[in-house]
UniProtKB/Swiss-Prot annotation:
It catalyses: (2R)-2-phosphoglycerate = (2R)-3-phosphoglycerate. Pathway: Carbohydrate degradation; glycolysis; pyruvate from D-glyceraldehyde 3-phosphate: step 3/5. Transmembrane segments: none annotated. Keywords: Gluconeogenesis, Glycolysis, Isomerase. NCBIfam families: pgm_1, PRK14115.1, PRK14118.1. Pfam families: His_Phos_1 (PF00300). It is an enzyme of class 5 (isomerase). GO terms for molecular function: phosphoglycerate mutase activity. PANTHER family: PHOSPHOGLYCERATE MUTASE (PTHR11931). This is 2,3-bisphosphoglycerate-dependent phosphoglycerate mutase. The record marks 181 as: Transition state stabilizer. The lineage of its organism: Bacteria, Pseudomonadati, Pseudomonadota, Gammaproteobacteria, Pasteurellales. Signal peptide: none annotated. Substrate binds at residues 7-14, 20-21, 59, 86-89, 97, 113-114, 182-183.
Length: 227
């Protein structure tokens, strides 16, 4: 069976080189075109889906809608869940990546961005931009809402959604599309493929490119490739 991952199209803060994380930003025109191209590619290759999973962030939701519209499948059920959100970049969210490197040093910022288990500084829960003050997360216990994450923590909060929602859907015979974010998809790919802690640091998923993961009937990994 096949599982298709798509990272959201190029966003406004991708263009501005800002740390985004859980901040809710829109797609650029380039991002819209990437999503359209992904949908057309899926249509041309004959990919049909029974259900789509995405995050609760606008850039992923819009990408999902565009992909499904272009592939003539906008009618299928979509499940939105915060566990597919991007990695939370803590107090770095909204900061310019280059300026942050100049302030803290390239090595420190590289550790924050690429270390598997070291998180950036926490975002104050009282900050106006904190998820604690966003009503889309109102039903999540406050001690579960992250203030900063590394990739390890991103996997730990995404994995229950894989086990409770995505995997059962696939095992029941449903054809699944997941439209999410660079780090939430990397985390799930790490689990599915069996990528080591060291190797995952160099595993990148470009925006708007359908990534196909071939699995056997027990969801064991076989191979992966881009369309």
């Amino acid at each position: 069976m096949e599982l298709v991952f798509i990272r959201h199209g190029f966003s406004e803060w991708n263009a501005k080189n800002l740390f985004t994380g859980w901040r809710d930003v829109n797609l650029t025109e380039r991002g819209v075109e990437e999503a359209k191209a992904a949908g057309k590619k899926l249509l041309d290759k004959g990919y049909e889906f029974d259900i789509a999973f995405t995050s609760v962030l606008t850039r992923a939701i819009k990408t999902c809608n565009i992909v499904l519209e272009e592939s003539h499948q906008l009618w299928i059920p979509q499940v939105k869940n915060w566990r597919l959100n991007e990695r939370h970049y803590g107090a770095l969210q909204g900061l310019d990546k280059k300026a942050t490197a100049e302030q803290y040093g390239d090595e420190q910022v590289h550790i924050w961005r690429r270390s598997y288990d070291i998180s950036p500084p926490d975002l104050d829960p009282q900050d106006p931009n904190s998820a604690h003050n966003d009503r889309r997360y109102a039903n999540i216990p406050s001690d579960v809402v992250p203030n900063a994450e590394n990739l390890k923590l991103t996997l730990e909060r995404a994995l229950p959604f894989w086990e409770d929602q995505i995997a059962p859907a696939m095992l029941s015979g449903k054809r699944v599309l997941v439209v999410a974010h660079g780090n939430s998809l990397r985390a799930l790919a790490k689990h599915i493929i069996g990528i080591s802690d060291a190797e995952i640091m160099d595993f990148e998923i470009p925006t708007g490119q359908p990534l196909v993961l071939k699995l056997d009937d027990k969801l064991n990994y076989v191979e992966h490739y881009y369309l």
